[in-house]
Amino acid sequence: MVLTIYAPLFASSKRAVVTLVEKGVSFETVNVDLMKGEQRQPEYLAIQPFGKIPVLVDGDYKIFESRAIMRYIAEKYRSQGPDLLGKTIEERGQVEQWLDVEATSYHPPLLALTLNIVFAPLMGFPADEKVIKESEEKLAEVLDVYEAQLSKNEYLAGDFVSLADLAHLPFTEYLVGPIGKAHLIKDRKHVSAWWDKISSRAAWKEVSAKYSLPV
């Protein structure tokens, strides 16, 4: 049974997509047009009752939330491709810790920047300059912590690439691209080296080329 991932073009979904590609798992995609409200249609709500993206369908099994999907893929296909979860319980703890940091500390200010700088103009809404300023300041503080961590380890959870690193790829691509604030990455030596490593991985290059930003 081939896995199916919904809405592969959007950043949140690409967390799941890059995990599938890293693991060498075959999958199909189904586009969901958020601008047309397809995520609120009954057939989509039947598999994602909150009307959000992404969703992974694996036969009769359905799972949503991008980081949960990443964990599911990494566990189910642990024996193939790179081990993205860590080899010991201590390494796994670090992977989980930095996945949570990405979700709770890194992603919120970056999402605010994405919405105000990239999507607000497309949707005809004024950007909130106060939110932009505050979000950039918050993200800079988070990245200072990353700089300290990455001065000790090659990757966030240790000296191995993991889900914690991959989870950062899609929205950081916005940060260094259409958001226009690459200096937040480049001005930090160790963060910059880390970003160069993870963004140059073959799996991410494939995902970026095949599933281009919807803006």
UniProtKB/Swiss-Prot annotation:
Disulfide bonds: none annotated. GO terms for cellular component: apoplast; chloroplast; cytoplasm; cytosol; peroxisome; plant-type cell wall; plant-type vacuole; plasma membrane. Residues 88-215 form the GST C-terminal domain. This is Glutathione S-transferase F10. Induction: By dehydration stress, wounding, H(2)O(2) and jasmonate, but not by growth regulators. Pfam families: GST_C, GST_N. One of its GO terms (biological process) is response to water deprivation. Glutathione binds at residues 11-12, 39-40, 52-53, 65-66.
